[in-house]
Regions:
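Intrinsically disordered, low-complexity segments enriched in serine/proline and basic residues
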Residues: 2-3
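Basic helix-extension-helix modules of the SAP/HeH family
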Residues: 10-63
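Short helix/loop capping segments that flank catalytic or ligand/cofactor-binding pockets
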Residues: 39, 186-187, 207, 421-422, ...
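Acidic/aromatic-lined carbohydrate-recognition and catalytic surfaces
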Residues: 58-129, 133-164, 177-429
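Alpha-amylase-like alpha-glycosidases and glucanotransferases acting on alpha-linked glucans and related
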Residues: 110, 244-393, 419-666, 670-671, ...
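Beta-strand-rich extracellular modules
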Residues: 165-169
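Structured C-terminal cap/extension of enzyme domains
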Residues: 674-727
């Protein structure tokens, strides 16, 4: 499509009158929640091309693409404006408890209609019609009228239904979700503050690990942290990964967020292991010993080797007989998982047989022609992968039980990834939920001047509404099933996401807006029912109203000391931090604090060719930031002396965040033991840096095992500091 840029920075079709095209594009984009421009990192307004808009609108289900004319756009706009008039009820209504909610009902003009609410417990009642006149519209040659009804303000929280019965016998139903106005929990309503620990579970190993931290290690780590006074343990996402090599190392690129990664299973902790025949146990012990020996020789975590050994061990245990009680538990788990669990397990079995997650076309989606036949042929492997999910859930549930039993107020804090792999089971099972031909990413900023493409397909806002937001509900329920809190990575994704058309650069995307009121409502409903705290990762450029909105809904934000600035780039004073937040010195995308003090991050970025400025300029900026931070630490009595040691600076930073009013304070385990290597170097792949494969080490590069933590001097000192100052 031939295009030119007009003076407003908006792309227009040069074959049509510019003003007409701008108006039509803006109207249809606005009507579908697609941004026609955005403010960049530098405060400049950037227009979005017509090509991008048309591709994105097409991905949203409209009959548009790059070749569309102004006439096509106008026809699509007509369809958009008539969409809600073509159905009796909206697909989903999300209403805050106590607030009431008015909704439209469309019927043949002049026809009567009755609308009932049906609660999840079966109780029923009628919705009242509101005296509000809206002129009828002609739809496909028929005059359609609109009536307005009201959701009673006193309906209880829950997943309910609306049922409309129209004169003539037509019946239509919709999902009705009554959600909390704000998350109400004792911890949030008290003046008490608590602290906890952030750890990458895969990197935190013990003498009993199979080369990677697991659920049994998690229980032990929680006990260690609780004994030191911590009230929560934040871990990386434990979502499902692919079942064959090469495994994806990033926990933030799972194949499904509904299901768990069986690599975190400890085979010996499965109940049936104890009753295995001696020969079977010897097979498992040999697999374990070989994996441990390899892990002790290598500097990095090898997920492929660990999973290959665990899979073989799990197959031995899976084949063992189970007691009636245990089999009954497994059967109930599979029944609750339903078709979603069955499809996930079948996807695993197919990928295992094909040796790749890029399945052939006749198996490329759950509705593909050969899939049901393969479900029968691969039934035993399907059973195995369903069993793995049961075992993983059981072991993670035990870790949360241990965390609470040893005194943690919150326990395990789960982490929820922003998206999934484009060839993963989540998209394979429900492709209609995702926008075709799109990837999620980020626009250019000061750190990534070409933008970012995360290679994750976005949920379609319309498809989510049509599904009653059940995929979101199930995802949140899964995250909270074995946790007392959830951190939502890039919580702005509940408001808007940067969509990039396939084949385009990350700079050629645009924002697509979601119904944040509905999505946050679903999250809060599930969190309220689970009694769980919700933390939103709201770093970066965020409109102030978004943070205000999250605060009003009872969601805690995230404050990182290096990102909290005031005039002149100076560190924000601790008393000015948000109280409704999790305050941190370090996060997984930053180097360990000791590594930053030593300049390791800048050296690495220079060696990898990632710096856009010369290294001395960057080092000068690092020195200035550390000098300003040091001055603040002195000012607030967080460090003493003119030349504090590296360890004193690290502890001083934690004294600083402990002085904030933030409800939660988190210490990174890497800081507690003096690690220096980054877990993740944003903007790099496995060819440049071993992201998400670095085991927990001390400042000399020696691995620190969980057994070492109770007596680790540096950790004990830092945790005692937090125990005494965060109340």
């Amino acid at each position: 499509m031939s295009s030119a840029r007009n003076v407003e920075g908006f792309f227009v079709d040069i074959h049509a009158p510019a003003s007409d095209n701008i108006d039509e594009l803006r109207r249809i984009a606005d009507a579908n929640g697609v941004a026609t421009g955005f403010w960049d990192w530098y405060g400049n307004w950037v227009g979005v091309s017509a090509s991008t808009l048309l591709k994105v609108l097409g991905a949203l289900g409209l009959p548009l693409d790059e070749s569309s004319t102004v006439g096509d756009v106008r026809e699509a706009l007509r369809l958009t404006e008539e969409r809600e008039w073509r159905r009796t009820l909206p697909p989903t209504i999300v209403a805050r408890q106590g607030g009431g909610y008015m909704f439209p009902v469309h019927v043949p003009d002049g026809s009567w209609v009755n609308v009932q609410w049906v609660l999840e417990d079966g109780r029923k009642g009628s919705c009242d019609q509101v005296d509000r006149y809206v002129a009828p519209r002609m739809i496909d040659g028929e005059l359609v009228g609109r009536a307005t009804f009201d959701v009673p303000h006193w309906l209880p929280l829950g997943w309910h239904r609306l049922v409309a019965t129209v004169e003539g016998g037509h019946v239509e139903s919709a999902t009705l979700i009554i959600v909390p106005n704000t998350l109400s929990l004792p911890l949030l309503e008290s003046s008490r503050r608590v602290w906890g620990v952030n750890a990458q579970l895969y990197s935190t190993r013990s003498a009993s690990s199979w080369g990677i931290g697991d659920a049994t290690d998690l229980a032990d780590l929680a006990a260690v942290c609780a004994d030191k006074g911590a009230d929560f343990l934040l871990i990386n996402p434990v979502h499902a990964s692919q079942p064959v090599s090469p495994l994806e190392n990033s926990p933030y690129l799972p194949v499904s967020r509904r299901w768990l990664n069986p690599i975190y299973i400890r085979p010996e902790s499965i109940e049936e292991y104890a009753s295995l025949p001696q020969a079977s146990r010897e097979v498992i012990e040999q697999l374990r010993d070989e994996t441990r020996q390899f892990a002790t020789r290598e500097d990095l975590i090898d997920r492929d080797r660990s999973w290959e050994a665990k899979r073989k061990a799990l197959e031995v245990i899976f084949a063992a007989p189970r007691s009636y009680h245990r089999q009954s538990q497994l059967d109930r788990f599979i029944e609750r998982g339903g078709s979603e669990l069955s499809n996930y397990a079948l996807w695993c079995a197919l990928v295992e047989r094909e040796g790749t997650i890029e399945l052939p076309e006749d198996l490329a989606r759950s509705s593909a022609p050969r899939v049901e036949l393969e479900r029968l042929e691969l039934a035993e492997r399907v059973d195995f992968y369903q069993w793995c999910q049961w075992v993983a859930a059981e072991q993670l549930e035990h870790a949360q039980h241990v965390a609470r039993e040893v005194g943690m107020e919150i326990g395990i804090m789960a982490d929820l990834a922003v998206g999934v792999h484009g060839y993963g089971s989540e998209k394979w099972s429900r492709p209609e939920l995702f926008a075709s031909g799109m990837s999620v990413g980020a626009p250019p900023d000061v750190y990534s001047q070409q933008g970012q493409n995360w290679s994750q397909p976005p949920w379609s806002p319309r498809s989510l509404a049509e599904s009653g937001y059940l995929p979101l509900r199930d995802m949140v329920r899964a995250a909270l099933a074995n946790a007392g809190a959830v951190r939502i990575d890039h919580i702005l994704g509940m408001f808007r996401l940067w969509w990039i058309p396939d084949g385009c650069a990350a700079t050629e995307g645009t924002y697509v807006y979601y119904d944040h009121e509905a999505m946050m409502g679903v999250i809060l409903l599930e969190a309220q029912r689970a009694g769980a705290v919700v933390i939103g990762e709201d770093l970066g450029v965020v409109e102030p109203w978004v943070r205000d909105y999250l605060r009003d809904r009872g969601v805690l934000g995230t404050s990182v000391v290096w990102f909290e600035k005031e005039g002149g780039g100076w560190p924000l004073r601790p008393e000015h931090y948000r109280d409704r937040a999790l305050a941190a010195v370090n996060i997984h995308d930053l180097p360990p604090t000791l590594g930053y003090i030593r300049g390791i991050q800048t050296t690495l970025r220079s060696e990898l060719g990632l710096l856009t400025d010369d290294i001395e300029t960057v080092r000068a900026g690092d020195r200035l930031e550390l000098e300003q931070m040091g001055a603040r630490l002195h000012e607030y009595g967080c460090i003493d002396g003119a030349e504090p040691s590296e360890r004193e600076i690290v502890e001083g930073l934690y004294r600083y965040v402990a002085k904030t009013p933030s409800k939660l304070v988190v210490a990174s385990l890497v800081d507690a033991v003096g690690d220096v290597r980054p877990q993740n170097m944003p903007g790099t792949g496995a060819d440049l840096y071993p992201n998400w494969c670095v085991p927990l080490c001390d400042s000399d590069g020696e691995e620190v095992a969980i057994e070492d933590l109770p007596t680790d001097e540096r950790l004990t000192s830092l945790f005692a500091l937090l125990r005494g100052s965060v109340r």
